[in-house]
Amino acid sequence: LQLHLSDDQGWSIWIETYPKLAGSRFYTKQDIQELVEYAEKRHVQVIPEIDVPGHTVSLLAKYPDMACIHQREAEKIIGKTGHMMLCAGNEEVYVMMDDIIREVAGMFKSPLMHLGGDEADIPKNWAKCDLCRLLMKKKNYTEPAQLMIPFFENILASVRKYGKKPILWFELNNEYPPADDYLFPYPKDVVLVSWRGGMTPTGLDLSAERGHNVIMAPGEHCYYDYPQYKGDLPEYNNWGMPMTTLERAYRLDPGYGRPLAKQHHIWGVMGALWGEAVIDINRATYMSFPRAFALAEAGWTQMENRSWESFKKRVLPNVNELMKAGVSVRVPFEIAR
């Protein structure tokens, strides 16, 4: 279970060194301890994520000096403002992040820690920042995206110092096809999560060539804030999402047709339920089940042993059991006939 603890929409964990980060609703250290212990008894590992350098409006709203120079005075509305980033050229950013990583790493037993790295709007931030441009000149860089190298050298050094193995969201040198390279050279010990659906095959091949382990979470199969049928859009963050039906979730091929010999670097699969699109716990379980059952089978079963017709028959008793237990689920009427 990976907990996405920070984003533009809020900061969800108490940090003693920076008490202004957390709003009115957050996990205390005791909450985290209880959650980790509860999960451990059920053989579940809880992995923390602090997303940087983008997705940081909730941080920058409280500590604006951590933004790029031209963004420090800009209005920052938590949950509405986007596209702001931590400044790559400000040494205080790395001091702050070291403190945050130290505290978060100390709360979780998992050897893994996710540090984000996705959807960084570099042209609107680092490319226009005097401090970032100064760092580019010092490093002899020609492209602002190269600043991801020293940025994550600092961030990942802290992760390793506090005993964790880093995970990052997988980004290529283009958001849409065609793309032919990483956004920046990922260190060898980084585990990558492939999430951009159309870019997944390219990323899968590049990571195999370069020796990176990957976790498969392509949005069109694995994003559970996406509606399950036409018109089932969320109450929040409705940006016209594509539809991920139960069948589409089940049809995930983690290896994208590659021979098994080229799939050894795939660690597993991940389903993502983004909380800004979820109003309460009932909506969370409704969006998760039964699609999470489909993901589990997709992750554990080779394609030649998979059968949608068989799954349809086997999933209904599990849906019924959840309903009997009082769990809010989406009843898949299209397969219940």
Protein language model regions, located:
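Substrate-binding groove of N-acetylhexosamine-processing glycoside hydrolases
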Residues: 34, 43, 91-112, 119, ...
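Substrate-binding cleft of carbohydrate-active enzyme catalytic domains
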Residues: 1-168
